[in-house]
Amino acid sequence: MKQNRIASLVEQDKKLLVAYYMPEYPVAGATLPVLEALQENGADIIELGIPFSDPVGDGPVIQEAAQRAIRNGVTVKNLLETVHNARRGAGCKAITVPIILMGYCNPLIAYGGDCFLNDAVEAGVDGLLLPDLPPEEAEDFLERAKSFGLTVVFLISPVTPPDRIEMIDSLSTDFSYCLAVNATTGTAKLAGEDADAAIEEYLKRVRQHTRKKFVVGFGIRDKARVMQMWKLADGAVVGTALLQRLAAAHTPGETARLAGEFWQALR
């Protein structure tokens, strides 16, 4: 089996900058140009959201982006078609960075378990992050995903006890995803000495109880915070701030330009 792009990337000694983008946000036709802009400006991994009508773990910005994506016609099926087009350079320069789909279980169940996994791999998806999939209940899914060569990423939070951190680390295929705060995505601001000290203590604790790499997300908005996370973790994820920057765009071209400018500033 061909080595997964994520596995190849995490073997490198580099800090990762991971983008989260909701397809077809804010306008239809934006996805492929945005993927190209993010790749060209240094995104190491791109997470694509799978829009869902009841995203309980997401903040208002991502909830609105998901609703906009649904109105703009995004489905699991055509999202996989978009990834396929991105990989072969149909509508944009060929996207070669790893792509992770992040979303809730219901749309994937509706699509059909193994059928989804097979189609995801065929399209060029590298990994999955499902926030509502408890690690304790994931054994069957994890084995099926691994059999298709897909990376599975699980979440760690500031209140995750050490033994559970170790379990999540063992189950995550290549790396884990640490929530920087106990909040819905994008709603928390990382600021102030107390917050910084708490985050540092938390991530040091994660480091002590993990063998694999981990990235940090939720609430990271600028280069200063990216650099802060790079000192403590193996990568930073930026999503809500990117979507906020794109919100006022009216065309796919304008969306891509704003995405590129925003991402370049993070580097």
Swiss-Prot record:
Family matches, as Gene3D superfamilies: Aldolase class I
Catalyzed reactions: (1S,2R)-1-C-(indol-3-yl)glycerol 3-phosphate + L-serine = D-glyceraldehyde 3-phosphate + L-tryptophan + H2O
Coiled coil: none
E.C. no: 4.2.1.20
Domain of life: Bacteria
Cellular component, GO annotation: cytosol
The entry's keywords: Amino-acid biosynthesis, Aromatic amino acid biosynthesis, Lyase, Tryptophan biosynthesis
InterPro entries associated with the record: Aldolase_TIM (IPR013785), RibuloseP-bd_barrel (IPR011060), Trp_synthase_alpha_AS (IPR018204), Trp_synthase_suA (IPR002028)
Class of this enzyme: lyase
Pfam families: Trp_syntA
Gene Ontology molecular function: tryptophan synthase activity
Active site: 47, 58
Pathways per UniProt: Amino-acid biosynthesis; L-tryptophan biosynthesis; L-tryptophan from chorismate: step 5/5
NCBIfam families, sorted: trpA
Family: Belongs to the TrpA family.
Assembly: Tetramer of two alpha and two beta chains.
Function noted in UniProt: The alpha subunit is responsible for the aldol cleavage of indoleglycerol phosphate to indole and glyceraldehyde 3-phosphate.
Record-given protein name: Tryptophan synthase alpha chain
Organism: Chlorobium limicola (strain DSM 245 / NBRC 103803 / 6330)
